């Protein structure tokens, strides 16, 4: 049995907080196990002067970490699941999905400010085509401005007055202890979140049976079922950073409820919701994707 595991992660404050959560869970599940952390710089960390969708759409924050796993430098990787491509390389697997945090988007602005109350022309920062598309549909009078950098950098730019408001993932703010910065939690029926938002995705080599066994206790069934449906939806559409796509699933007893959206950059979009058996999340994800593609999503993707 392995006595030491090495986790690979990006070096941002949020990535490290999430990695330490996984490290602590591993050591709690396996007393005596030593877990080390290696920082890895990805292409998405280096290129900060262009919007994400202008760089490329496959694994911007993932590829270099996977290469370190293949080389044997690390045993597993911790990601924000929303950064993972919809289909992993055949030699990699999503080995564990710990319990999901708040999947909603959060408005960060003056205390008490809401999305509905933002004044016309307000400058709203976001790096996400998904958020921008839905915001344009909801509030075409807002001025949307690209926003890059880690959470601290984004908050600093807001304080400096470069933006009137910014939209970030609530889970990241909460994990960093920045709940107080949130002026409004935006419900999923207003802004459908990114696929996997709020989930920590633990990736490992598909053939590393010992690491997979060690990670098994960290997997949360509800998170696994939900993200499987969401990722099936995304894979069916073929979406990445260059396509405004969102999906959120949650369990209601034995049923799984899945919301999804496909959009265009100008704010046109199709949205929908389906229920299905929790025993077939892939089928539900594909069914909703097919429905939205047939209802106009295919034309939106074609431009």
UniProtKB/Swiss-Prot annotation:
Cofactor notes: Binds 1 dipyrromethane group covalently.
Modified residues (S-(dipyrrolylmethanemethyl)cysteine): 241
Enzyme class, first EC level, given as a word: transferase
Keyword Transferase: yes
Reaction(s) the record says it catalyses: 4 porphobilinogen + H2O = hydroxymethylbilane + 4 NH4(+)
Pathway(s) per entry: Porphyrin-containing compound metabolism; protoporphyrin-IX biosynthesis; coproporphyrinogen-III from 5-aminolevulinate: step 2/4; Porphyrin-containing compound metabolism; chlorophyll biosynthesis
The enzyme's E.C. designation: 2.5.1.61
Keyword field: Chlorophyll biosynthesis, Porphyrin biosynthesis, Transferase
CDD domains: PBP2_EcHMBS_like
Pfam families to which the protein is assigned, alphabetical: Porphobil_deam, Porphobil_deamC
Requisite cofactors: dipyrromethane
GO terms under biological process: chlorophyll biosynthetic process; protoporphyrinogen IX biosynthetic process
GO-annotated molecular function: hydroxymethylbilane synthase activity
GO cellular component: cytoplasm
Domain of life: Bacteria
Note: The porphobilinogen subunits are added to the dipyrromethane group.
Entry's family note: Belongs to the HMBS family.
Known function: Tetrapolymerization of the monopyrrole PBG into the hydroxymethylbilane pre-uroporphyrinogen in several discrete steps.
Subunit structure: Monomer.
The protein, known as: Porphobilinogen deaminase
């Amino acid at each position: 049995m392995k006595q030491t595991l090495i986790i690979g992660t990006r070096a941002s404050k949020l990535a490290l907080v999430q990695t330490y959560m996984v490290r602590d869970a591993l050591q709690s599940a396996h007393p005596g196990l030593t877990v080390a952390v290696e920082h890895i710089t990805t292409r998405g960390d280096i290129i900060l002067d262009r919007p994400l969708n202008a760089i490329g759409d496959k694994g911007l924050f993932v590829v270099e970490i996977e290469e370190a796993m293949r080389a044997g430098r690390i045993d597993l990787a911790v990601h924000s699941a929303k950064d993972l491509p919809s289909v992993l390389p055949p030699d990699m697997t999503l080995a564990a999905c710990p319990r999901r945090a708040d999947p909603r988007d959060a408005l960060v602005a003056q205390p008490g400010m809401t999305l509905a109350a933002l004044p016309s022309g307000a400058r709203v920062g976001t790096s996400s085509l998904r958020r921008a598309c839905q915001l344009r549909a909801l509030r075409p009078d807002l001025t949307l401005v690209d926003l890059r950098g880690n959470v601290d950098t984004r908050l600093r730019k807001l304080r400096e007055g470069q933006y009137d408001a910014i939209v970030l993932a609530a889970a990241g703010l909460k994990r960093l202890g920045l709940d107080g910065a949130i002026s409004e939690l935006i419900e999923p029926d207003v802004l459908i979140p990114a696929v996997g938002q709020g989930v920590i995705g633990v990736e490992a080599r598909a053939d590393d049976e010992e690491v997979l066994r060690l990670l098994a206790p960290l997997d949360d069934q509800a998170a696994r079922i939900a993200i499987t449906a969401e990722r099936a939806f995304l894979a069916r559409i073929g979406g990445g950073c260059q396509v405004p796509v969102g999906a959120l699933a949650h369990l209601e007893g034995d049923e799984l409820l899945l919301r999804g959206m496909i959009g265009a950059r100008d704010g046109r979009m199709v949205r929908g919701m389906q229920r299905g058996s929790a025993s077939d999340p892939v089928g539900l994800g594909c069914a909703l994707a097919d429905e939205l593609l047939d209802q106009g999503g295919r034309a939106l993707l074609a431009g």
